[in-house]
Amino acid sequence: MTNQPMLHMLQKSSLHTLLLLTAKVLSRTGFGEVQILDRRQERQKSRFGGHELMCESSFGSLPLKVIVKVINDGIRVRMLDELAGAVIRTKADLGIIVSPCHVTATARKLQPHYQAARVNIIDGAELVDQLQRLGIAVRPSGEPDYSFFGAMEEVGRRVNSFLRMEAV
């Protein structure tokens, strides 16, 4: 059963907080070095063709590249199409779309068609499970760590303020 308070916290979090949480989950689950690329605003377009995080690792001499799209909206077919195109264009080994929200029925039904492009989905329930399993943003009692989320939102505000000053 999904931790509803945690799911609610994720759904009301900023994109910046979701990017940082997703990067932390990927790093702790062995995806190697995780880079947050240039998109930090909800309506901003990614200059990297549909993804915001890049994970690079290697197993022996075999390099591995995973691209991740983080959104704060329901996962729709269009988003799967964009990520599949990005996986193919960047020659990535895997693409992951992460959202604290739901997956539309059509996207869920068509997801098997994206296996050739190696596109996976992490929805809100799965993200909550990963965070709880790894002990990220959750208290020992299982409830969300509200102070952690508050600190992440503050970091996001400061980064956005800095980026606005840099753009001037």
Language-model features: where?
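Mixed-charge (Asp/Glu-Lys/Arg
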Residues: 1-168
